[in-house]
Protein backbone atom coordinates (compact mmCIF):
# COMPACT_ATOMS: atom_id res chain seq x y z
CA UNK A 1 0.00 0.00 0.00
CA UNK A 2 1.23 3.52 -0.82
CA UNK A 3 0.27 6.77 0.94
CA UNK A 4 -1.95 8.89 -1.33
CA UNK A 5 -3.43 11.83 0.57
CA UNK A 6 -5.07 13.08 3.77
CA UNK A 7 -8.76 13.50 4.51
CA UNK A 8 -10.57 14.89 7.54
CA UNK A 9 -11.37 12.26 10.16
CA UNK A 10 -15.00 11.18 10.38
CA UNK A 11 -16.71 8.59 12.61
CA UNK A 12 -16.04 5.10 11.29
CA UNK A 13 -12.52 5.82 10.03
CA UNK A 14 -9.79 3.60 11.46
CA UNK A 15 -8.01 5.35 14.33
CA UNK A 16 -4.71 3.68 13.41
CA UNK A 17 -4.64 5.76 10.20
CA UNK A 18 -4.82 9.12 12.04
CA UNK A 19 -1.62 11.14 11.58
CA UNK A 20 -0.94 12.25 15.15
CA UNK A 21 1.93 14.55 14.17
CA UNK A 22 -0.37 16.54 11.90
CA UNK A 23 -3.07 16.51 14.59
CA UNK A 24 -0.62 18.00 17.09
CA UNK A 25 0.22 20.87 14.74
CA UNK A 26 -3.29 21.66 13.51
CA UNK A 27 -5.56 20.54 16.37
CA UNK A 28 -7.51 18.59 13.76
CA UNK A 29 -7.60 14.88 13.05
CA UNK A 30 -6.51 13.84 9.56
CA UNK A 31 -6.64 10.28 8.27
CA UNK A 32 -4.08 8.89 5.86
CA UNK A 33 -5.54 7.37 2.71
CA UNK A 34 -3.66 4.72 0.82
CA UNK A 35 -3.57 3.34 -2.70
CA UNK A 36 -2.88 -0.20 -3.77
CA UNK A 37 0.72 -0.62 -4.92
CA UNK A 38 0.42 -0.26 -8.67
CA UNK A 39 1.91 -2.59 -11.28
CA UNK A 40 1.77 -0.02 -14.06
CA UNK A 41 1.55 3.74 -14.35
CA UNK A 42 0.07 5.23 -17.51
CA UNK A 43 -0.45 8.74 -18.84
CA UNK A 44 -3.05 9.14 -21.58
CA UNK A 45 -2.30 12.09 -23.87
CA UNK A 46 -5.45 13.21 -25.69
CA UNK A 47 -5.36 15.64 -28.61
CA UNK A 48 -8.12 18.19 -27.98
CA UNK A 49 -7.38 20.44 -30.97
CA UNK A 50 -10.02 21.69 -33.39
CA UNK A 51 -9.60 18.94 -35.98
CA UNK A 52 -10.65 16.35 -33.41
CA UNK A 53 -14.10 17.96 -33.34
CA UNK A 54 -14.96 16.77 -36.84
CA UNK A 55 -18.20 14.89 -37.40
CA UNK A 56 -20.24 14.24 -40.53
CA UNK A 57 -22.28 17.27 -41.65
CA UNK A 58 -24.92 14.90 -43.04
CA UNK A 59 -25.39 12.29 -40.31
CA UNK A 60 -26.08 12.45 -36.59
CA UNK A 61 -23.11 10.59 -35.15
CA UNK A 62 -20.37 11.16 -32.62
CA UNK A 63 -17.39 13.32 -33.44
CA UNK A 64 -13.81 12.11 -33.27
CA UNK A 65 -13.37 13.77 -29.89
CA UNK A 66 -16.51 12.10 -28.50
CA UNK A 67 -15.22 8.75 -29.75
CA UNK A 68 -11.88 9.52 -28.09
CA UNK A 69 -13.61 10.49 -24.84
CA UNK A 70 -15.32 7.11 -24.70
CA UNK A 71 -12.04 5.37 -25.50
CA UNK A 72 -10.23 7.18 -22.67
CA UNK A 73 -13.06 6.41 -20.24
CA UNK A 74 -12.95 2.71 -21.15
CA UNK A 75 -9.17 2.50 -20.91
CA UNK A 76 -9.15 4.33 -17.57
CA UNK A 77 -11.72 1.93 -16.16
CA UNK A 78 -9.57 -1.05 -17.21
CA UNK A 79 -6.43 0.47 -15.69
CA UNK A 80 -8.08 1.14 -12.34
CA UNK A 81 -9.79 -2.25 -12.28
CA UNK A 82 -6.31 -3.83 -12.43
CA UNK A 83 -5.00 -1.48 -9.69
CA UNK A 84 -2.86 0.32 -12.27
CA UNK A 85 -2.41 4.08 -12.09
CA UNK A 86 -3.77 6.24 -14.90
CA UNK A 87 -3.61 9.96 -15.61
CA UNK A 88 -4.88 12.21 -18.38
CA UNK A 89 -3.29 15.12 -20.23
CA UNK A 90 -5.36 17.17 -22.70
CA UNK A 91 -3.44 19.20 -25.28
CA UNK A 92 -3.67 21.14 -28.52
CA UNK A 93 -0.62 23.33 -29.21
CA UNK A 94 0.04 23.30 -25.45
CA UNK A 95 -1.07 21.37 -22.39
CA UNK A 96 -4.69 22.32 -21.66
CA UNK A 97 -5.33 20.20 -18.57
CA UNK A 98 -3.41 17.58 -16.60
CA UNK A 99 -4.65 14.95 -14.15
CA UNK A 100 -1.76 13.05 -12.47
CA UNK A 101 -1.84 9.23 -12.47
CA UNK A 102 -3.60 7.60 -9.52
CA UNK A 103 -4.69 4.03 -8.88
CA UNK A 104 -7.64 4.59 -6.53
CA UNK A 105 -10.96 3.39 -7.95
CA UNK A 106 -12.48 6.78 -7.10
CA UNK A 107 -9.96 8.41 -9.46
CA UNK A 108 -12.23 7.45 -12.36
CA UNK A 109 -14.48 10.35 -11.34
CA UNK A 110 -11.57 12.75 -11.83
CA UNK A 111 -10.89 11.37 -15.30
CA UNK A 112 -14.54 11.53 -16.34
CA UNK A 113 -14.83 15.07 -15.01
CA UNK A 114 -11.78 16.09 -17.02
CA UNK A 115 -13.21 14.49 -20.16
CA UNK A 116 -16.52 16.31 -19.84
CA UNK A 117 -15.16 19.80 -19.28
CA UNK A 118 -13.50 20.76 -22.55
CA UNK A 119 -14.29 21.23 -26.22
CA UNK A 120 -12.07 20.50 -29.21
CA UNK A 121 -10.47 23.76 -30.31
CA UNK A 122 -7.18 25.37 -31.24
CA UNK A 123 -4.28 24.34 -33.42
CA UNK A 124 -2.20 21.18 -33.03
CA UNK A 125 1.47 20.96 -32.06
CA UNK A 126 2.04 17.33 -31.04
CA UNK A 127 5.80 17.56 -31.41
CA UNK A 128 6.13 20.61 -29.15
CA UNK A 129 3.84 19.13 -26.51
CA UNK A 130 5.66 15.79 -26.48
CA UNK A 131 9.01 17.55 -26.26
CA UNK A 132 7.86 19.53 -23.21
CA UNK A 133 6.19 16.57 -21.50
CA UNK A 134 8.72 13.79 -22.00
CA UNK A 135 11.07 14.79 -19.17
CA UNK A 136 8.13 14.94 -16.75
CA UNK A 137 6.71 11.52 -17.57
CA UNK A 138 7.66 8.79 -15.09
CA UNK A 139 10.25 6.39 -16.51
CA UNK A 140 9.44 2.72 -17.04
CA UNK A 141 5.76 3.51 -17.50
CA UNK A 142 3.23 3.65 -20.35
CA UNK A 143 2.09 6.49 -22.57
CA UNK A 144 -1.04 6.26 -24.72
CA UNK A 145 -1.21 9.00 -27.35
CA UNK A 146 -4.61 9.57 -28.98
CA UNK A 147 -4.87 11.92 -31.96
CA UNK A 148 -5.87 12.11 -35.61
CA UNK A 149 -2.21 12.87 -36.47
CA UNK A 150 -3.36 14.89 -39.47
CA UNK A 151 -1.18 17.95 -38.97
CA UNK A 152 2.55 18.17 -38.49
CA UNK A 153 4.31 14.95 -37.41
CA UNK A 154 7.61 16.00 -39.02
CA UNK A 155 9.42 15.38 -35.73
CA UNK A 156 7.17 12.62 -34.41
CA UNK A 157 9.95 10.07 -35.00
CA UNK A 158 12.34 12.03 -32.77
CA UNK A 159 9.68 12.44 -30.07
CA UNK A 160 8.71 8.78 -30.03
CA UNK A 161 12.35 7.70 -30.06
CA UNK A 162 13.00 9.84 -26.97
CA UNK A 163 10.01 8.30 -25.17
CA UNK A 164 11.25 4.80 -25.97
CA UNK A 165 14.81 5.66 -24.86
CA UNK A 166 13.43 6.44 -21.40
CA UNK A 167 11.98 2.95 -21.14
CA UNK A 168 8.39 4.02 -21.83
CA UNK A 169 5.89 1.69 -23.45
CA UNK A 170 4.01 3.68 -26.08
CA UNK A 171 0.66 3.05 -27.77
CA UNK A 172 -0.67 5.28 -30.55
CA UNK A 173 -4.37 5.34 -31.36
CA UNK A 174 -4.99 7.25 -34.59
CA UNK A 175 -8.64 8.28 -34.75
CA UNK A 176 -10.08 9.31 -38.11
CA UNK A 177 -13.60 9.78 -39.44
CA UNK A 178 -14.64 7.69 -42.48
CA UNK A 179 -15.09 10.99 -44.38
CA UNK A 180 -11.39 11.73 -43.84
CA UNK A 181 -10.42 8.35 -45.22
CA UNK A 182 -12.71 8.30 -48.26
CA UNK A 183 -13.68 11.92 -49.11
CA UNK A 184 -17.20 10.81 -50.11
CA UNK A 185 -18.60 14.27 -50.88
CA UNK A 186 -20.03 15.12 -54.29
CA UNK A 187 -20.52 18.36 -56.17
CA UNK A 188 -19.00 21.76 -55.44
CA UNK A 189 -17.99 21.73 -51.78
CA UNK A 190 -16.44 24.27 -49.43
CA UNK A 191 -13.96 22.75 -46.98
CA UNK A 192 -13.25 24.76 -43.84
CA UNK A 193 -10.35 24.12 -41.48
CA UNK A 194 -11.30 23.41 -37.87
CA UNK A 195 -7.97 24.79 -36.63
CA UNK A 196 -7.70 28.10 -38.53
CA UNK A 197 -9.76 30.24 -40.92
CA UNK A 198 -8.69 28.48 -44.12
CA UNK A 199 -11.49 27.74 -46.59
CA UNK A 200 -11.16 25.94 -49.94
CA UNK A 201 -13.85 25.39 -52.55
CA UNK A 202 -13.59 22.52 -55.02
CA UNK A 203 -15.30 19.47 -56.50
CA UNK A 204 -14.11 16.43 -54.49
CA UNK A 205 -14.31 14.14 -57.50
CA UNK A 206 -11.38 16.06 -59.02
CA UNK A 207 -9.06 15.18 -56.13
CA UNK A 208 -10.60 12.09 -54.52
CA UNK A 209 -8.13 9.55 -55.89
CA UNK A 210 -5.12 11.74 -55.13
CA UNK A 211 -6.47 12.55 -51.67
CA UNK A 212 -7.08 8.91 -50.76
CA UNK A 213 -3.54 8.08 -51.85
CA UNK A 214 -2.11 10.94 -49.76
CA UNK A 215 -4.03 10.04 -46.60
CA UNK A 216 -3.01 6.39 -46.93
CA UNK A 217 0.64 7.40 -47.34
CA UNK A 218 0.35 9.49 -44.17
CA UNK A 219 -1.11 6.54 -42.27
CA UNK A 220 1.53 4.15 -43.62
CA UNK A 221 4.31 6.58 -42.67
CA UNK A 222 3.14 6.80 -39.06
CA UNK A 223 2.72 3.04 -38.92
CA UNK A 224 6.24 2.51 -40.28
CA UNK A 225 7.75 4.89 -37.73
CA UNK A 226 5.87 3.14 -34.93
CA UNK A 227 6.94 -0.34 -36.01
CA UNK A 228 10.57 0.76 -36.29
CA UNK A 229 10.62 2.04 -32.72
CA UNK A 230 8.65 -0.76 -31.09
CA UNK A 231 5.64 1.51 -30.62
CA UNK A 232 2.20 -0.08 -30.79
CA UNK A 233 -0.06 1.52 -33.38
CA UNK A 234 -3.77 1.12 -34.11
CA UNK A 235 -5.91 2.99 -36.63
CA UNK A 236 -9.50 3.55 -35.55
CA UNK A 237 -12.24 5.19 -37.53
CA UNK A 238 -15.25 6.38 -35.61
CA UNK A 239 -17.33 3.45 -36.85
CA UNK A 240 -14.94 0.93 -35.26
CA UNK A 241 -16.44 -0.70 -32.14
CA UNK A 242 -14.55 0.52 -29.08
CA UNK A 243 -14.27 -3.08 -27.90
CA UNK A 244 -11.61 -3.65 -30.58
CA UNK A 245 -9.42 -0.88 -29.16
CA UNK A 246 -9.95 -2.03 -25.58
CA UNK A 247 -9.12 -5.63 -26.51
CA UNK A 248 -5.95 -4.39 -28.22
CA UNK A 249 -4.89 -2.68 -24.99
CA UNK A 250 -5.70 -5.76 -22.87
CA UNK A 251 -3.48 -7.91 -25.09
CA UNK A 252 -0.69 -5.37 -24.70
CA UNK A 253 -1.18 -5.28 -20.92
CA UNK A 254 -1.06 -9.08 -20.79
CA UNK A 255 2.24 -9.13 -22.69
CA UNK A 256 3.76 -6.63 -20.24
CA UNK A 257 2.73 -8.81 -17.31
CA UNK A 258 4.77 -11.68 -18.73
CA UNK A 259 7.95 -9.61 -18.95
Spans of model-derived segments:
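An amphipathic, basic-hydrophobic helix/alpha-beta surface used to engage anionic
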Residues: 1-102, 142-146, 152-153, 158, ...
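Von Willebrand factor type A / integrin I
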Residues: 2-5, 135-141, 153-259
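Short amphipathic alpha-helical interaction patches enriched in hydrophobic/aromatic residues
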Residues: 52, 56, 115-119, 206, ...
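Conserved phosphate-coordination/catalytic loops
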Residues: 66, 120-127, 150, 213-216
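Short, contiguous clusters of charged residues that form electrostatic/catalytic patches at enzyme active sites
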Residues: 70, 74, 124-131, 154, ...
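Short, electropositive alpha-helical surface patch
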Residues: 97-113, 228-231, 251
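Short beta->alpha junction loops/turns
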Residues: 104, 148-149, 238-239
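Von Willebrand factor
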Residues: 107-144, 153-155, 176-177
Amino acid sequence: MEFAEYKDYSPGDEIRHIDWKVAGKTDKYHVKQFEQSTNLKCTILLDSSGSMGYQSPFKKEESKIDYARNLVAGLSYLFLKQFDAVGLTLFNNQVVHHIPPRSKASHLKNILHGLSNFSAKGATAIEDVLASLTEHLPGRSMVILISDFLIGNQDIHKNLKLLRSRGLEVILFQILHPDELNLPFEGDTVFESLEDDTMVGLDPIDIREEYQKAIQEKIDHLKKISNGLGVDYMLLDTSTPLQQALSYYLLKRKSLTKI
